[in-house]
Regions:
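Flexible, polar/acidic helix-loop-strand segments at domain edges
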Residues: 89-90, 94, 353-436
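Short, surface-exposed recognition loops and adjoining beta-strand edges that mediate ligand/DNA contacts
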Residues: 27, 55-78, 168-171, 201-220, ...
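Conserved, well-structured interaction surfaces
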Residues: 34-56, 80-162, 174-210, 410-433, ...
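Glycine-rich, aromatic-lined ligand/substrate-binding cores of catalytic
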Residues: 50, 287-291, 295-394
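Membrane-proximal, proline-rich intrinsically disordered regions
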Residues: 14-69, 94, 247, 533-543
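Long, intrinsically disordered, low-complexity segments
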Residues: 15-16, 112-115, 189-191, 212, ...
């Protein structure tokens, strides 16, 4: 049994004579570079987005995005009468009461390892084609660099969520040989892989239409290298329950023939991204427009097109009230909303909009949220009961059943420009889903400088001045808040809270939150089905 079957527990490729999507005969594939690129490289991009639950890095429900977002102080999924109880799933996420028997967590693990396995498979066959002289050395290096980069990215997400994980790079690895590696070892592997492949990756912009649209290019690798170094204290810690982390100033990387500490490494790779021409867009919303492939800020996206791609974009349509969606032409589900603490961070401290001071409200609030009176194409929306639909951003609780705000409590996700040509359920939009962008790079650079004893004021000022906000001192606390204001709904909040040591704190309305005095919940459990499949696997601490 190979890695795909052993780790994912799914009916993946179980024999090395099977071939990827495309179903070309081996003899034909050996004579065609185009087939190799399509079936062994291009096919892997089908798995970055998704069209079913727990599949895709973003866009689908109950997967990587929800485990990294609904578990935080950023957003929540209140129970609304008969809707969104879902066997207590969302309540478990918000209160950190997940267990090793959570099927959704198991599905997320399987998805991540399915893609890793497919990458290993592609590398195996690319190697075979090289030795049959189908590929030139340049083609071989380019293809393997791209696949290794993708594999490293999926290992990044897997390590970030699950800590000590199996690190398998050989497609022929038998189950009996599969064991977990310490998180620090996986971290160094990912970092070294990205460093090794970066010179062989194209420097083209992955977010722009063209031959490298949506592909893993050099700036994507640089972004991940910066993100890894920024979290080096977390990822170098193999015992996350003892309350002790290594100091980033004493964690070193070999970069450009120099030894740099973690924070210096972050700054180095952020500068590399700048040198490739990435800049902030003049208007924040351009990054999330229907045709956001023109953004000079977006670094890596999931391509979306309601005619060409089956990737789903569930988050907005699951958030909006049914009447709101109906006015747009979508079938929406009235679910997720922002938390009260998020509203407070944006300056919303009074539920009556007529009493608010607009000067105290962050300008990004109006792009990130639907709140107060709902307008569609400038027209007020009827809530279905003869009233104007109004969202109440501060009327939020874990369970709104029976509340006057059961249907309209909480500010809802906006962020992306409304695409009125999307499919009826609002999922197949033309806005590309943004995974990595340059504003994050500036905030990473600012944070690294502060952690290294310097000033990150210039970088933080760039981000805030773009949205015409007042200057704030670039302290660590202010940078964490700025990351919420800038990156709301983008899937980074869990990662940020863990790095700042705040993930286990009691968020607003978490009345049933688990008490975690050791930090064990900063890593998710290995699910029971995975443990039973492979007796070499060991459960993470605390579960």
């Amino acid at each position: 049994m190979i890695l795909g079957t052993a780790m994912a527990g799914m009916a993946l490729t179980s024999c090395l004579d099977e071939y990827p999507k495309g179903e070309v005969e081996e003899a034909e594939a050996y004579t065609s570079v185009a087939y190799i690129e399509r079936d062994l490289v291009g096919d892997l991009y089908n798995y970055i987005g998704g069209d079913s639950p727990s599949h895709g890095l973003q866009g689908t429900i109950r997967g990587v995005y929800d485990w990294n977002s609904v578990t935080t102080d950023e957003q929540m999924m209140p129970v609304r009468g008969a809707d969104w109880d879902d066997g207590g799933f969302w309540n478990r996420l918000y209160n950190h009461r997940w267990t090793s028997s959570d099927g959704e967590l198991s599905s997320t693990w399987k998805y991540l390892y399915e893609v890793i396995s497919r990458c290993n498979r592609s590398l195996y066959f690319i190697d075979r084609y090289r030795y049959r002289l189908v590929l030139t050395n340049e083609q071989y290096e380019a293809f393997t660099a791209e696949v290794r980069g993708l594999r490293a990215m999926f290992y990044f997400y897997t390590m970030d969520m699950f800590g000590n994980i199996p690190l398998v790079t050989d497609y022929n690895t038998p189950v009996s040989d599969i064991r977990q590696s310490p998180r620090s070892e996986v971290f160094r592997f990912i970092f070294n892989e990205l460093q090794e492949v970066a010179p062989y990756l194209k420097s083209e912009r992955s977010n722009e239409l063209g031959n490298y649209y949506g592909r893993f290019t050099r700036p994507v690798a640089y972004f991940l290298l910066a993100k890894l170094a920024l979290n080096a204290e977390v990822y170098s810690d193999n015992d996350w329950t003892d309350g002790i982390r290594p100091d980033g100033r004493s964690i070193y990387f070999s970069v450009d023939e120099k030894q740099l500490n973690a924070w210096e490494t972050v700054v180095y790779y952020c500068q590399e991204i700048y040198d490739l021409g990435y800049r902030l867009e003049e208007y924040y919303g351009t990054n999330f427009a229907i045709h956001n492939e023109v953004s000079k800020e977006n670094i890596f996206v999931i391509p979306m097109d309601n005619n060409l791609y089956s990737n789903r974009f569930n988050y907005i349509f699951r958030s909006l009230h049914a009447a709101h969606g109906g006015a747009i032409g979508w079938g929406t589900e009235n679910g997720t909303c922002a938390t009260v603490s998020t509203m407070n961070a944006y300056g919303i401290t009074e539920d009556n909009p007529s009493k608010r001071d607009p000067g105290e409200i962050d300008s990004r609030y109006y792009i990130n949220f639907h709140s107060d009176t709902v307008l569609v194409k400038g027209q007020k929306v009827n809530d279905g009961y003869g009233n104007v639909l109004v969202y109440h951003p501060l009327e939020v609780a874990e369970n709104l059943t029976g509340s006057p705000f059961e249907r309209n409590g909480g500010a809802r996700m906006a962020k992306y420009e409304t695409d009125f040509t999307a499919s009826e359920d609002g999922t197949l939009q033309n806005n590309d889903i943004v995974l990595f962008r340059y504003a994050d790079v500036l905030l990473m650079q600012a944070e690294a400088k502060v952690r290294n004893g310097g000033s990150g004021q210039e970088e933080m000022d760039f981000v805030r001045s773009r949205v015409h906000e007042k200057i704030r001192e670039a302290t660590l606390d202010n940078l964490l808040t700025e990351r919420l204001l800038e990156l709301m709904w983008e899937g980074w909040r869990r990662n940020d809270l863990i790095r700042f040591g705040k993930f286990t704190e009691l968020y607003d309305h978490r009345v049933n939150a688990v008490v975690d005095n050791t930090g064990y919940t900063t890593v998710f459990p290995i699910t029971g089905d995975v443990l039973s499949l492979n007796p070499n696997m060991v459960q993470n601490p605390g579960y």
